[in-house]
Amino acid sequence: MADLSSVDEFLNQCKQSGDAAYGALRSVLERLEDPNTRSKARIFLSDIYKRVGSSETSLQTYHFHIQDIYLDQYEGFQSRKKLTMMVIPSIFIPEDWSFTFYEGLNRHPDTIFKDKTVSELGCGNGWISIAIAAKWLPSKVYGLDINPRAVKISWINLYLNALDDNGEPVYDEEKKTLLDRVEFYESDLLGYCRDNKIQLERIVGCIPQILNPNPEAMSKLITENASEEFLHSLSNYCALQGFVEDQFGLGLIARAVEEGISVIKPAGIMIFNMGGRPGQGVCRRLFERRGVRVTQMWQTKILQAADTDISALVEIERSSPHRFEFFMGLSGDQPICARTAWAYGKAGGRISHALSVYSCQIRQPNLVKIIFDFLKNGFQEISNSLDLSFEDETVADEKIPFLAYLASVLKNSSYFPFEPPAGSKRFCSLIAGFMRTYHRIPINQDNIVVFPSRAVAIESAFRLFSPRLAIVDEHLTRQLPRSWLTSLAIEDTSMDKSDDQITVIESPHQSDLMIELIKKLKPQVVVTGMAPFEVITSSSFLHLLEVTKEIGCRLFLDISDHFELSSLPASNGVLKYLAENQLPSHAAIICGLVKNKVYSDLEVAFVITEVDAIAKALSKTVEVLEGHTAIISQYYYGCLFHELLAFQLADRHAPAERESEKAKSEEIIGFSSSAVSILKDAELSVTEIDETSLIHMDVDQSFLQIPQSVKAAIFESFVRQNISEAEVDINPSIKQFVWSNYGFPTKSSTGFVYADGSLALFNKLVICCAQEGGTLCLPAGTNGNYVAAAKFLKANVVNIPTESSDGFKLTEKTLTKALESVKKPWVCISGPTVSPTGLVYSNEEMDILLSTCAKFGAKVIIDTSFSGLEYSATSWDLKNALSKMDSSLSVSLLGCLSLNLLSGAIKLGFLVLDQSLIDAFHTLPGLSKPHSTVKYAAKKMLALKEEKASDFLDAVSETIKTLEGRSRRLKEVLQNSGWEVIQPSAGISMVAKPKAYLNKKVKLKAGDGQEIVELTDSNMRDVFLSHTGVCLNSGSWTGIPGYCRFSFALEDSEFDKAIESIAQFKSVLAN
């Protein structure tokens, strides 16, 4: 320890080396930290200053330098005018860079730091932290630096200015000293504040912005005893941080901003020094893409420090098109690149660069914090794609809340939960809430049915009611099947005619012309919109209601063009009418949501009806025809509705008293007879009872954990802006996918069609089959949703018997026997994985089946939607089989990216279409196409699969291992409970026959008493559900008499509950 009684002895020790000088100064600091020796130590520092003065030569002689920094040169400044500061060679030495930064701080209002909690990043010798405390009287200033020696010198400087030359405390106007206001800590950026949960109100930073010319040096362990050269470079250069801004030397600033977002209070301000070398646009974008508003407080030019090596910037220019901005001297006004500046500097010239001080505030801070909190938990790589910069504030107000909501969903949920196919309950509730709050229409979520799009809603309604004659607004016919628009079967529209043919007449958009057509043609269904001038009042709508009711016609009124998602929606006569009158039973409202500020192609639609039977029938129809509505679309628009409702006080107004419908039309068209039959028998999702109590083993969705890489792809698809067409062109990825996984060849003439799921694509193929007079051949043991859909679409369906000895798979014998008596056969084969049995077709089996189909001239649909999770290695190679076939054989490949990519409810259906079907398929335009964000995410996930990314492949392997283990466990429980089980080899489902239960009488609870029920295929599902709370599919759904389907890709605790409930079911026999 240095002898404090002798200045000479102290100085002699300092002369020896920088390390010796630092050791002597540390001993002084120890005395300063001790209240008993503090005053004497401060006087000792004064004596040293008097001896060495402020000459810069002391830095070479004694390895330290003491200087005065003058804070304010103007009159009226009441506080201290100067600080006395010490520096040593191994820390950042105050120069133009930091003086300009302080000038920028001075340009803020005097209240900027008053009573605030402040942190300075890269405090160096602490002079700015101390100056802030001296001038603006903050509550606390935390000076942080990664250089441990800088922190020690900062503490010395704090005591040097907190006490006077006589060792007495210097008090400010609030009777506090600098020691009350300032603390210094060793910290990598804001690590100290984050670890100690310190919430900041102001963050200031004067941070290095040039990459170290020797990157390896930055990876050394930082210790107080490291070499002076290393510690000096640590204070003057930055290392690579893993951000895109690294290419400009701004990676450390980028990390500082992101760390700042996590610890700053919502109304907080961050102030940074920004060297203009990368260009002002690059500097501003660093902040703006992170959701930070930027104000330039001060800009000047400064000379580049002579000891700063800019060779790293020269290397960046060499390997990229970017050019940095330097100037020749302070007076130069034409920028030069880093290479020219480097050469000019080497030749003795002085180079300068712009220097700006930016004041930054987070837009929508609480939401942006949620986004960054999500990113830092394993999604840091997405940060480089993040773009929260918006020229239009209304766009920011829409997108940022959604990103925060999506981040919360992905962070807090390991999987996407089951949602009713006709719309998530939350989304329907939000729509109803919006209608009640903004339009005073007292409806609830049960009056809302959600569809993927307006076009799908209209087509679904037609298929449910099967009108022989309909009139449709000319603006709404574009997405209808061409056959409906070209049929001329309008002569006889009597109620007892066959309802197979739908004829649509196109009508002018104007309501008086529409009404004239309705009166003359007397259609059974009318679908129309309204002109802008007609929707202002309710008279046109009222007229339409009266005319359609009079002739017994159903009316679907489209209000999509007039429905505003706004806190001040424009007047709407239709909604005014509904606020005062109940919607008549023959009418329904269709609304397509397309008016968002961000995604013009993101659509979801809903239908409002106040007839419970119609709401239920439409709900079942959308499930049969579409399977589901994309959950992301519901999340997006649900977020918009939520934003409009969140600030409202609930139930401020009593529900409106409305006029009831006076008389109902007697002769109005009902559901088609075939639709009624199919919807009654189809085992669709159970949604009528309390959802929380149900365990869904009856859905084709995985509820297993979604991998981080998949969540990353989903989130990245939304955080990016200006995504190019090539990045959402999924055709090349699908071509590679079907080739790599199934050996399925494609040609230039092959068609590629996409939808929100595979069921919608399958249904279009069914319609193609029906239009050419074909027969759809489905094996017994086909997914029941497909069978129900085909029958609903009135296709000619032939069931091909299968045998339990073959695992209910197709064989050459069963297929040949079936095709011998069928004209124009279309054969649908589920494979490699068969749904619902979970068995797998081998290459040899597929070769035989394709040969058999070719022999009979059958068109083939291979459905791969349930494949990709085979328990043992299965490699399909259809190329060899197809190469042996006649070129006239039509084979199309259907699939869905969900199970195989572990993406849960995020689905993309694809159809690789044989050339012979392309023209026919495109006469059926009403497909709900996947949104560009879904395509982007799917393409990223397919790339992970193709590149064999280890994290993704590990997740797939773990999922397969989980499913295989569950299949064994479920089989064991079922067998022990009297079930006959077909052991699966792949996928998420299995089939089992309740051998011990079928045709047995059991007693079940019925209200307050009991009833005796005989268990059959037709009631097995209901009985099992009522006794166990588990939803399964019975033999009526599987097509295999007696065999029920169990889907076991449940969340862990749900699976355990299901196992327990299944085991308890055998107790019904005890009755």
UniProtKB/Swiss-Prot annotation:
Top EC group: transferase
Residues with the N-acetylalanine modification: A2
Top-level lineage group: Eukaryota
GO CC annotation terms, alphabetical: cytosol; plastid
The keyword Hydrolase is annotated on this UniProt entry: no
EC number annotated for this UniProt entry: 2.1.1.12
GO molecular-function term, one example from the UniProt record: S-adenosylmethionine-dependent methyltransferase activity
Primary subcellular site in the record, as a coarse category: cytoplasm
UniProt xrefs under InterPro entries: Aminotransferase_I/II_large (IPR004839), Met_S-MeTrfase (IPR025779), PyrdxlP-dep_Trfase (IPR015424), PyrdxlP-dep_Trfase_major (IPR015421), PyrdxlP-dep_Trfase_small (IPR015422), SAM-dependent_MTases_sf (IPR029063)
Cystine residue pairs: none
Transferase in keyword set: yes
Subcellular location: Cytoplasm
Key words of the record: Acetylation, Cytoplasm, Methyltransferase, S-adenosyl-L-methionine, Transferase
CDD domains registered for this protein in UniProt: AdoMet_MTases
Reactions the enzyme catalyzes: L-methionine + S-adenosyl-L-methionine = S-methyl-L-methionine + S-adenosyl-L-homocysteine
Tissues where this protein is expressed: Expressed in roots, rosette leaves and cauline leaves. Expressed at a lower level in developing seeds.
Family matches, as SUPFAM superfamilies: PLP-dependent transferases, S-adenosyl-L-methionine-dependent methyltransferases
GO BP, sorted A to Z: biosynthetic process; methylation; S-adenosylmethionine metabolic process; selenium compound metabolic process
A UniProt-annotated Pfam family: PrmA
Cross-referenced PANTHER family: METHIONINE S-METHYLTRANSFERASE
Function: Catalyzes the S-methylmethionine (SMM) biosynthesis from adenosyl-L-homocysteine (AdoMet) and methionine. SMM biosynthesis (by MMT1) and degradation (by HMT-1, HMT-2 and HMT-3) constitute the SMM cycle in plants, which is probably required to achieve short term control of AdoMet level. Also able to catalyze the selenium-methylmethionine (SeMM) from AdoMet and selenium-methionine (SeMet). May play a role in phoem sulfur transport; such function is however not essential.
Family in the record: Belongs to the class I-like SAM-binding methyltransferase superfamily.
Protein name: Methionine S-methyltransferase
Organism of origin: Arabidopsis thaliana
